Swiss-Prot record:
GN (gene name): pip
One Pfam family, short name: Abhydrolase_1
GO CC annotations, alphabetized: cytoplasm
Record protein name field: Proline iminopeptidase
Annotated source species: Serratia marcescens
Primary enzyme class: hydrolase
UniProt cross-references to PANTHER family, sorted A to Z: PROLINE IMINOPEPTIDASE (PTHR43722:SF1)
Length: 317
């Protein structure tokens, strides 16, 4: 039986800083690995999730030069939890600014969950800048998928956890959970915001792995939850600021020439495996791996194994 791959050993960033976007945001970025290695950009999830030192370990440090960054309003980027000038297209422009700052012509784009959404939006806008793509836990931000996770679908698998999400809502508000939480997450009362943020964030933290994870507790930490919930709800309220429900699938022909690996857990409750299947049907050149016995998170054993194989293989080019 094949031994499952794990992360590369921990490593420090060799450079870091903040990029001033010119419209009120400062984006935290860092570079790790080999300064002369193959360029890659890591796009985190959420939106609002931020980067972790573990994310550096997805890439061979001897063969990759990896740029990681906290998207607007989250992680170490400032202002914290800000929704102003914070849309998908602002983030696409930020990635281009970071590419130019790093002196990179083309790079591998790695994104999971919301990171796969943003990776697709970026690649479809700037296909000439993308050498390869590694996508995990596919999320194309269609209304039906939001309804599954925030209204009626995943709730049937986690009824006791969903009950906590509904606990602060009236019967009438429960008809549109995203809208009801929008009211609270943009309230003038910081305590109302924080209460809603923690419930929203913990719901995701407790449902993204097939088996319970100790790391889900971090989703309830005040600073993380506030940015995560406010930004995520903001994007979902506006349907990702996309032109249409099928924009990312419709525009796949723009990127079909880019080598790509798609990895998705069979029992992903946050982003159904149908998302990956639909993307792969639109993109037959892409390599699809549906991982049995796995949920949504990148660090579940079978998912991580496929991601590591993909980054190693692309580094060999």
């Amino acid at each position: 039986m094949e031994q499952l791959r794990g992360l590369y050993p921990p490593l420090a960033a060799y450079d870091s800083g903040w990029l001033d976007t010119g419209d009120g945001h400062r984006i935290y970025w860092e570079l790790s690995g080999n300064p002369n290695g193959k360029p890659a950009v890591f796009i985190h999830g959420g939106p609002g999730g931020g980067i972790s030192p573990h994310h550096r370990q997805l890439f061979d440090p001897e063969r990759y030069k990896v740029l990681l960054f906290d998207q607007r309003g989250c992680g170490r980027s400032r202002p914290h939890a800000s929704l102003d000038n914070n849309t998908t297209w602002h983030l696409v422009a930020d990635i281009e600014r970071l590419r130019e700052m790093a002196g990179v012509e083309q790079w591998l784009v790695f994104g999971g969950s919301w990171g796969s959404t943003l990776a697709l939006a970026y690649a479809q806008t700037h296909p000439e800048r993308v050498s390869e793509m590694v996508l995990r836990g596919i999320f194309t931000l269609r209304k039906q998928r939001l309804h599954w996770y925030y209204q009626d679908g995943a709730s049937r698998f986690f009824p006791e956890k969903w009950e906590r999400v509904l606990s602060i809502l009236s019967d009438d508000e429960r008809k549109d959970v995203i809208a009801a939480y929008r009211q609270r997450l943009t309230s003038a009362d910081p305590q109302v915001q924080l209460e809603a943020a923690k419930l929203w964030s913990v719901w995701e933290g407790e449902t993204v792995t097939l088996l319970p994870s100790r790391e889900s507790a971090s989703f309830g930490e005040d600073d993380f939850a506030l940015a995560f919930a406010r930004i995520e709800n903001h994007y979902f309220t506006h349907l990702g600021f996309l032109e249409s429900d099928d924009q990312l699938l419709r525009n796949v022909p723009l990127i079909r020439h880019i080598p790509a690996v798609i990895v998705h857990g069979r029992y992903d409750m946050a982003c159904q495996v149908q998302n990956a299947w639909d993307l792969a049907k639109a993109w037959p050149e892409a390599e699809l791996h549906i991982v049995e016995g796995a949920g949504h998170s990148y660090d579940e054993p079978g998912i991580l194994h496929q991601l590591m194989i993909a980054t190693d293989r692309f580094a060999g080019k």
